[in-house]
Amino acid sequence: MSRLGNRADWADDEEFDDPSALPPQQVTTNKDGTKTVVSYRFNDEGKKVKVTRRIKTTVVREHVNPQVAERRSWAKFGLEKGHAAGPSFDTTSVGENIVFRPSVNWRAQAAEAEKAGGEKGSIKDQLKDKKVKCRICSGEHFTARCPFKDTMAPVDESTGAAGGEPGAEDEAAAGGLGAGTSSYVPPHMRKGAASGGERMAGKYEKDDLATLRVTNVSELAEESEIRDLFERFGRVTRVFLARDRETQRAKGFAFISFADRSDAARACEKMDGFGYRHLILRVEFAKRAT
């Protein structure tokens, strides 16, 4: 019996080492108030890694309303009964504190804002499906913002001029307005107004003689590439590549303005029929305002 009592049990062996066991975490308090935490873990390769972290604790004191502090200590009730103290992230969102100060006539202001918002919304719905079209180059932008408004005539003006001059009957009718009476006749309806306006239309003759229209352009083309193609023949002052407003891809045509007409003529001769991005370019002079 004495021999059995002195025999050590294998379960009481404290020196048994498990190769997969990790050493316990060690926390050391430093003199400066920080804590050094040493822990161990296994990395992705299965090797034991030692991790040392130094933690500094900072106490932030906040002065709040005593009633607010008291409400925070209340026990939760209702659907939140039994939950931990503090806001729950699934039911509470913490945001900026906004101070609401209603004015005296806030009802009238709210009614006016609602009315204005309804009118804007209706106008927006009406113009939602409408697209802006330039009258000069047929691009999807306002005519006033067209880069070629000073070099090309609008489409309606060019087509109207091609139809011929107004007849004598129209001139007589326009000139006869207000004859013998004191009624007012608008300047554009007076006799000779059309011819005078045509003589004054010098803005369309500024540099339209040196502007080329390029068609059959790839939808993947870029303005810089087109400029590089045509700058070989002379100084290019402006390049406009029409793009789709939604997809931002080229619409198939572009305008190139040269500083000298001779350079534009040479570029038109060389680049007409030129292969670019698997397409054959069609180059011609832009229609001049008549």
UniProtKB/Swiss-Prot annotation:
GO terms for biological process: formation of cytoplasmic translation initiation complex; translation reinitiation; translational termination. It is found in: Cytoplasm. It comes from the Eukaryota. Signal peptide: none annotated. The keyword DNA-binding does not apply. Residues 1-35, 157-200 are annotated as: Disordered. GO terms for cellular component: eukaryotic 43S preinitiation complex; eukaryotic 48S preinitiation complex; eukaryotic translation initiation factor 3 complex, eIF3e; eukaryotic translation initiation factor 3 complex, eIF3m; multi-eIF complex. GO terms for molecular function: RNA binding; translation initiation factor activity. InterPro entries: eIF3_g (IPR017334), eIF3g_N (IPR024675), eIF3G_RRM (IPR034240), Nucleotide-bd_a/b_plait_sf (IPR012677), RBD_domain_sf (IPR035979), RRM_dom (IPR000504). Residues 210-288 form the RRM domain. The keyword NADP does not apply. Gene3D superfamilies: 3.30.70.330. Keywords: Cytoplasm, Initiation factor, Protein biosynthesis, RNA-binding. Belongs to the eIF-3 subunit G family. RNA-binding component of the eukaryotic translation initiation factor 3 (eIF-3) complex, which is involved in protein synthesis of a specialized repertoire of mRNAs and, together with other initiation factors, stimulates binding of mRNA and methionyl-tRNAi to the 40S ribosome. The eIF-3 complex specifically targets and initiates translation of a subset of mRNAs involved in cell proliferation. This subunit can bind 18S rRNA. Component of the eukaryotic translation initiation factor 3 (eIF-3) complex. This is Eukaryotic translation initiation factor 3 subunit G. It comes from Aspergillus clavatus (strain ATCC 1007 / CBS 513.65 / DSM 816 / NCTC 3887 / NRRL 1 / QM 1276 / 107). The gene is tif35.
